[in-house]
Amino acid sequence: TNYAGQILMFNNPRDSYGIALKKLGYSQNTTNRDELDQATDELKKQKLLIQAYVMDEIFPKMTAGEAALAPYYAGDAVTMIGDNPDLDFVVPKEGTNRFVDAMVVPKSSPNKDLAEQFINFMLEEDVALANIEYIGYSTPMSNVKARLDEEVQNSFSYPDDEVLSRCETFVNLDEETTAYLQDSWTGVLSYGDSSIGDILFLAVFFLFLIGIVIYFTVKKHRNHTI
């Protein structure tokens, strides 16, 4: 509650439920409805503290100091901390999502050979080094990592085995679970909105009643005066 109104949250169900499930000690890939429902309850409680549900907007908001806490990607965190030294990046003790970016060639690609040549080019040591230094994300190439400056080889870009043991990689969920997550997420986003609407309705209703009372009081007074 110390950060109420200063927290940003991912605006998509997969990431948000992954965070809630990890907090509860469950797998972020669970299909268990009871566990998903518990995560829904956690997200609804969290909504009272949220400033905004966003995605890419996390980058400029955190860099500008418009929020205090937000989930985001380790590679972008390198750039964000460079822009705002007051920021830091931590992996929760419960763990987090371990993601992998990859270059692939569509099966139907009309330029398969050219695409493979481009991938080979990006994997050349000097090119890969320049790419990693520019984008801030980590490299799987040990020869490239060895050439990085020590400050670049920081703990959150290249976490140790203990941290990785607490992380999971997202897997594709079945269609039924995906639909259930989406419906549940819609419920999270709309949670509390109806109560606000009810309050506004009652406020307008009472103002209307007060207006009627005033109208007839004034009218009665005028008639009595006449």
Can you say where each PLM-predicted feature lies in the sequence?
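Extracytoplasmic ligand-binding site segments that recognize negatively charged/polar headgroups
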Residues: 1-66
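Periplasmic-binding protein-like
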Residues: 36-44, 83-107
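Short, hydrophobic alpha-helical packing/hinge segments within bilobed ligand-binding/sensory domains
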Residues: 58-61, 77, 115, 128
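A ligand-binding cleft/hinge motif common to bilobed small-molecule-binding domains
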Residues: 63-64, 69-86
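Ligand-binding "clamshell"
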Residues: 79-91, 150-155
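Mature extracytoplasmic/periplasmic domains
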Residues: 106-166
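Conserved C-terminal helix/tail region of periplasmic/extracytoplasmic solute-binding proteins
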Residues: 162-226
